[in-house]
Regions:
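Loop-to-transmembrane alpha-helix entry segments
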Residues: 75-76, 98-112, 122-125, 224-225, ...
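Hydrophobic alpha-helical transmembrane segments in multi-pass integral membrane proteins
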Residues: 91-96, 145-152, 186, 240-249
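Selective hydrophobic functional segments
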Residues: 52-101, 184-227
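Selected transmembrane alpha-helices and immediately adjacent juxtamembrane segments
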Residues: 2-43, 125-175, 182
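Signature of the 12-TM Major Facilitator Superfamily
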Residues: 48-55, 80, 106, 173, ...
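Structural signature of hydrophobic alpha-helical transmembrane segments
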Residues: 10-11, 41-58, 102-112, 141-151, ...
Length: 249
């Protein structure tokens, strides 16, 4: 699909995808790519979907880092995840640029399914903060590779942070540092590898508008709808999207 000559209907769908990503980000802090990229991959080239998400992903995480900066209790954990996440993301992005679109589509679908399964089964493993800080570099590298490859590292990041006894605010701050750092290096890498041109860059920048509108709505939604009900709706939606991506020719 020619991204620069979209019809109005497709453009509207893309805006809704980013708005929905912002909604999920504002409600759970889980990361807008986990919903936006699978939606985008249904309608446009999956590699373009990943590239488009990088800039608004950086933007949304910087907002939440600023919003929750006063809640940090373990800055070392956030720092280690961010630093090693960028290292892994660099290698993942190199693989992303060199591989086929269909491979990226399947990776997006499989990682999304992994996210759904991990959300349904829950996480019975509990880690102390001391152990978490020790394994954070490894988690960061693995999460970074996955992020660079398909733009969705939520299953790894959420599984790790959910094993810790931390507040929602500290959770959002830590995961935003992780996602934000990876988004930054992903953008730089894509530009350096000549995968992103300035037209795509501007379209991605414009996508920050619907995403930023969705974030406060997501925050408000959690006050009206139970978190469990909201998550069930999102998981059902992700199952449908992933199945569609896998079965598409």
């Amino acid at each position: 699909m020619d991204l620069y000559n979209l019809d109005f209907q497709t453009l509207l769908i893309l805006c809704l995808a980013f708005a929905l990503g912002g909604l999920v980000k504002g409600a759970t802090g889980a990361g807008s790519p986990v919903i936006a990229i699978p939606v985008l991959a249904v309608f446009i080239d999956a590699k373009l979907a990943v590239a488009l998400m990088a800039i608004p992903n950086l933007f949304s995480n910087l907002i939440q880092i600023h919003q929750y900066k006063d809640t940090k209790k373990s800055p070392k954990l956030a720092f280690n995840l961010a630093v090693f996440g960028t290292l892994g993301c660099l290698f993942g992005t190199i693989f992303f640029v060199s591989t086929s679109t269909r491979t990226i589509e399947l990776v997006v679908a499989l990682v999304t399914i992994l996210y759904v399964i991990s959300s349904i089964t829950g996480n019975s493993v509990k880690l102390s903060m001391q152990i978490a800080k020790s394994v954070a570099p490894a988690i960061g590298i693995v999460g970074g590779i996955v992020q660079g490859t398909c733009g969705v590292s939520a299953p790894i990041a959420l599984g790790f942070l959910n094993s810790l006894q931390i507040s929602r605010n500290e959770f959002i701050f830590t995961i935003s540092c992780f996602f934000g750092a990876m988004a930054g290096i992903q953008i730089i890498s894509l530009l350096a590898l000549n995968f992103v041109d300035w037209q795509l860059f501007l379209i991605a920048a414009f996508s920050m508008v619907p995403l930023s509108l969705g974030m406060p709505l997501g925050n408000r939604l959690t006050k009206r709808l139970s978190k469990k009900s909201f998550e069930r709706l999102i998981l059902l939606f992700l199952i449908i999207l992933s199945t569609n991506i896998i079965l598409s020719p």
